[in-house]
Swiss-Prot record:
Belongs to the peptidase C85 family. Residues 141-163 have a biased composition (Gly residues). It catalyses: Thiol-dependent hydrolysis of ester, thioester, amide, peptide and isopeptide bonds formed by the C-terminal Gly of ubiquitin (a 76-residue protein attached to proteins as an intracellular targeting signal). GO terms for molecular function: cysteine-type deubiquitinase activity; K63-linked deubiquitinase activity. GO terms for biological process: negative regulation of canonical Wnt signaling pathway; positive regulation of TORC1 signaling; positive regulation of TORC2 signaling; protein K48-linked deubiquitination; protein K63-linked deubiquitination; proteolysis; regulation of immune response; response to lipopolysaccharide. It is an enzyme of class 3 (hydrolase). This is OTU domain-containing protein 5-A. It comes from Danio rerio. The active site is at D219, C222 (nucleophile), H327. CDD domains: OTU_OTUD5-like.
Amino acid sequence: MTILPKKKPNSSVGVSDHPDDPDRRTGSDPHQHQHQHSHGVRPGARPRASPPPWSYQAAPPASREDRRTESSSRPQQASPPPVGAGSSGGPGDATGMACVSGNRAELSGGVGCGGGMGGCCSGPGLSKRRRQATCSGGVAGGGTGPGAAGGGGGGGGGGGVGGPSPEQEEGAGYNSEDEYENASRLQSEDPATVEQQEHWFEKALQEKKGFVIKKMKEDGACLFRAVADQVYGDQDMHEVVRKHCMDYLMKNADYFSNYVTEDFTTYINRKRKNNCHGNHIEMQAMAEMYNRPVEVYQSGTEPINTFHGIHQNNDEPIRVSYHRNIHYNSVVNPNKATIGVGLGLPAFKPGFADQSLMKNAIKTSEESWIEQQMLEDKKRATDWEATNEAIEEQVARESYLQWLRDQEKQARQPRKASATCSSATAAASSGLEEWNARSPRQRSSAPSPEIPDPAHSDTAAKPPSPAGALALSKPPSPCAPGPSNQACVGPDRPTSSSLVSLYPALGYRAIMQEMSPTAFGLTDWEDDEILASVLAVSQQEYLDSMKKNAMHREPSPDSS
């Protein structure tokens, strides 16, 4: 904290500016403490109209009683004593000190506190220490004690008459007690005790209210830093807050100048310095400027003072904490965002940006997770498809190999069966005589173009062997299943050479007939197709047998 040099107090209290009116007195020593917030700011909205000008005439007893009643209802605010019968109102009388009463809108003039009554200061700017020190040094027995520091208040003895001092007029107009060098010397408490109280204060505020005290830099701008942290979220914006506050005070100088004892322009110019402290006047101005209540906490969980704006609303208040009667910190509610409230931003919702960022982050995370899961599913599906394809290929290969083995096995089985059947037929037909009757098949096929040339016409006219008839009339032989049993039936008395010559053809036909038509892409054979194939085989066998018989029956030329 920057301590300004102490100026000598001014003892201009009690000097009448109007000699013709003995009841007019100056009420010039409010000595408003910068950080003591026990003054009675009237809560709620107030009209923008400026208050009436300062009246130097002493109020009647009835009005003072009303003010005392109103002031006594507010905490930590003393009321000025009523005007006594023995008090003198002349311009030369020595008054104890100026008594400030009421809230911001009510300031009373100084009253002489003689007749053995001690002078007492009250008002929004005076701290307990100052009031106690002033009241303890009050007048007794018609004399007056020392006045309030910095505001003026002459000390007189004997008859109690004190005149204005040029040395005391220089320091008139300071409103804050901590602007004096003796402010630091007023701290009589033990530092360890103060530290313990501060720790208890922070702990109680956090446990009961959930608030957190945010430390501000101690450079004389702590109040503006705390408000900047509440409004802008950055304590380094204190210069902007100070500038706006001073501009607001200048625009409403007709109202706020009633609470400043010094020249208002000088006061504003001094407060524009970055190392100059702020007090209750600046708090009220900022409450109206941001239209947010300002709550001040000190060693307790309930605010000791609340400054209200002009219009009532439901916005979160600006919370500051007051420490050691000299420093302000910011009180933050971590569960509710208040940054930006009061700046006049349209459709502004505190914390909406953080919520939007959180939603966007969650959405992006979900999309990334979904894409990752889809990629994993595709990988698993690709592996599954490749595995299925490999399995299908392996099954097809094994099935094809098994089919080839089955075909080879089936191709070997009909050859053995046909050879056995042919040997049995040759043994059975060796004892039969040749049958010269012509078969019906031969009759029907006589005019066929397949008859041999005219040289063998006589051979064709002979009755053929009834092989075709036997092939059609006899039931299938069990030696060869299916339509191949006709291949086992030959002429009644064929020679062994003819049977042997038929073995390859019969074996091939048997293999073809044993195979399923589905192997060739065909359906099951019908009866007509089976009958046609049997007739063709029978005809071919008959023709072959006729040729062989004709060759054996031709007599040799030398035998005749």
